[in-house]
Amino acid sequence: MEREDDSIFLFHAPCENCGSSDGNSVYSDGHEWCFVCEHRVPANEEREAKLSTRRRTGGSKPMSYDVWNFGDSNGRYSDLTARGISKETCQKAGYWLAKVDNRMYQVADYRDQNGSIVSQKVRDKDKNFKTTGSHKSDALFLKHLWSGGKKIVVTEGEIDALTVMELQDCKYPVVSLGHGASAAKKTCAANYEYFDQFEQIILMFDMDDAGRKAVEEAAQVLPAGKVRVAVLPCKDANECHIMGEDKAILEQVWNANPWVPDGVVSALSLKDRVKEAMTSEDAVGLLFDGCQGLNDRTLGARGGEVVMVTSGSGMGKSTFVRQQALAWGKRMGKRVGLAMLEESVEDTIQDMMGLNNKVRLRQSDEVKKAIAEDGRFDEWYDELFGDDTFHLYDSFAEAEADRLLAKLAYMRTGLGCDVIVLDHISIVVSASEESDERKMIDRLMTKLKGFAKSTGVVLVVICHLKNPEKGKAHEEGRAVSITDLRGSGALRQLSDTIIALERNQQGDMPNLVLVRLLKCRFTGDTGIAGYMEYNRETGWLEPSSYTGGEGEGDTGWTEQDGQSDF
């Protein structure tokens, strides 16, 4: 019985007695207990040895062979007397003592959400650290114990996390950074969705320069409005505990102040900065490709703006935004995020490669086969994507709103994307179970606008048009009005710039596109910005010298081939 008291819970597994899929609990010494039928399997050395390779339900991988085995390493749980941490807390957390080659070590087990050990941090008496297993950049100690709630405390190291755990009787969420303060931003960004499950995120980092720097870096990539910062009277949580300042720690857990970013400054000190900003290229914004008139009317797209692109079905919206993304990423050196929800990432990549090499790659099996065989594929791919400028949302046809927003936020705060393209907003709304589409769009647009404004990203969003009640369709050259946007008034109210593409698919010049500016909050300008023409050989929307009259997109155009290829 003493042996089982020292064991720790590892994971849930099927019960061989009652058939429950996950009611059975497996422990580190090999014994099992089913909470459904109360069937107990006793521990033995053979069963314990098999635990390191036992597969979990759902086909997940076994424990890594290169992590330290509790038995082989003469492992034991013990009070950390010098740190004021009990054996019970260490057992709950998976923090144990090992004796290898007559040397003592402290071992922190890092587990995945299923409870399997994936890596460990090992520390010797001289405070030298090393890791075992697959210790990835998103590693958080104790993450497997918690899955949402009101508060979660984040500390720099395992000992501080154990301290907070000790003071709260192991009942409330606390984790520590797997790679310390220097990697706080990267670790927190990689765990954005995990932290977003909690209402408050309390950063209880060390009270030194490195800790304060880590707070500022980490807070910026965590969910907005949720971050709070703990201020302690000693260097860290464990030192407070040792010095009898437990009350100060708990006070910060429950009453830490919200994080307020740096940036409140006197206007008197901004004179030189404002002058420089007025004369910099950034003041013009990111210029649009292929239509100079659009740049003349908008002066480009600025950080924090929502740019809406709309047209009838099959009119060139996706081609237009892909072309802009390529120009911004390749020519201007901006980082670009692409959430193209109507197509797979493989299709998006092929279209971007085709545009960059002026060939309609995805539509030509002959060209695809040729470049794969003659080596051009690697050349084209590396030339466009080798500098890691483009990042894609890889969830074809999966667009649940909150999950999507978390991914977009990671593109901006974690990957540093300057521009994000969302194609299209209608598919996000249709993925919701909510019946009121108008209210859904209102909320989604409010979140998108807040996201763009708070992070400074240029957010390009595609939306569809509603079908006109009478008269010709938009696909037949009907002029687009700002009230034609399908869904809610929030689409036009919260967008900074709205660009409409018009063409007559059945007219004499079906590949000629009229570019109409419906709104520009920055300049106040509206009207026809110019014309672009689709090149069937290169896949590009190119500048056109056509100057037809407004509302007469199919009048006076000379017939070419009567075919449309958007």
Swiss-Prot record:
Q: Where is this region: Disordered?
A: 542-566
Q: Where is this site: dTTP/dATP binding?
A: R360, H464, R503, R521, Y534
Instruction: State the needed cofactors, names only.
Output: Mg(2+)
EC identifiers of the protein: 2.7.7.-, 3.6.4.12
Tree of life domain? Viruses
| Domain Toprim: from-to ranges | 150-237
What function is annotated for this protein?
Answer: ATP-dependent DNA helicase and primase essential for viral DNA replication and recombination. The helicase moves 5' -> 3' on the lagging strand template, unwinding the DNA duplex ahead of the leading strand polymerase at the replication fork and generating ssDNA for both leading and lagging strand synthesis. ATP or dTTP hydrolysis propels each helicase domain to translocate sequentially along DNA. Mediates strand transfer when a joint molecule is available and participates in recombinational DNA repair through its role in strand exchange.
**HAMAP family in alphabetical order:** Helic_Prim_T7 (MF_04154)
Protein's name in the database: DNA helicase/primase
What taxonomic classification does the UniProt entry list for its organism? Viruses, Duplodnaviria, Heunggongvirae, Uroviricota, Caudoviricetes
